[in-house]
Regions:
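Hydrophobic anchor at the beta1->P-loop junction of P-loop NTPases
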Residues: 8
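Glycine-rich phosphate-binding loop used to anchor ATP phosphates in small-molecule kinases
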Residues: 53-95
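P-loop (Walker A) phosphate-binding loop of NTP-binding proteins
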Residues: 11
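Small-molecule kinase domains that catalyze NTP-dependent phosphoryl transfer to phosphate-bearing small molecules
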Residues: 119-161, 169, 173
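Conserved substrate/cofactor phosphate-moiety recognition/catalytic segment
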Residues: 21-67
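Walker A/P-loop
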Residues: 17
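Conserved phosphate-donor/acceptor-positioning beta-strand/loop module used by diverse small-molecule
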Residues: 94-113
Length: 173
């Protein structure tokens, strides 16, 4: 079985986890979800630093899932500054079979979305501002570009877009 990577990146509060879980729900056991927050904050309880312990286990999880499920969803902030090694690993592991999305939202929109989350009291708007990265695109100059998720898109529209993109690539095979 050939697996496809679906990478969802963006700032805190942009909706990455919500979308990843919704896509996983649609595909069920045909999709595995590797969430940066789960590995970093829940399994290891480590700070968001380059090459933290969670990065290694996330790599192992991707390697384990590759070839066992059709879809590997990887979601998180994954800033280029801190996670370039991990991102390079993913791009090399999936040279053809990948969809890369970036949640291109304003800071104000991420704060608004954060207020609807169960974790809204875990960190403040001020903390979010410190973490904020404007358009931290993985391929800023290259022909291979992230597909941008924009502010006005609903959850359903975003999930449908990912599903359609996924099916289009599968049909090409």
């Amino acid at each position: 079985m050939e697996s496809m990577l679906i990478l969802l990146r963006g700032n805190s509060g942009s909706g990455k986890t919500t979308i990843a879980k919704a896509v996983q729900h649609v595909f069920g056991e045909e999709a595995v979800l590797i969430s940066q927050d789960v590995f970093r904050r829940e399994i290891f309880c480590v700070k968001d630093t380059p090459n933290n312990l969670a990065s290694g286990l996330m790599k192992e999880a991707v390697l384990y899932a590759k070839g066992k499920v059709p879809m590997i969803l990887v979601e998180g902030i994954y800033s280029r500054e801190k996670y370039q090694d991990f991102l390079d690993f993913l791009m090399k592991l999936f040279p053809q079979k990948k969809l890369v999305y970036y949640f291109d939202l304003s800071f104000e929109e991420t704060v608004k979305r954060h207020q609807t989350r169960m974790q809204r009291d875990y960190f403040s708007e001020e903390t979010m501002r410190k973490w904020w990265l404007a358009r931290d695109l993985l391929f800023p100059q290259e022909s291979l570009k992230e597909r941008l998720i924009k502010e006005g898109q609903t959850i359903a529209e975003t999930v449908n877009q990912i599903m359609a993109d996924y099916e289009e690539i599968r049909r090409r095979d």
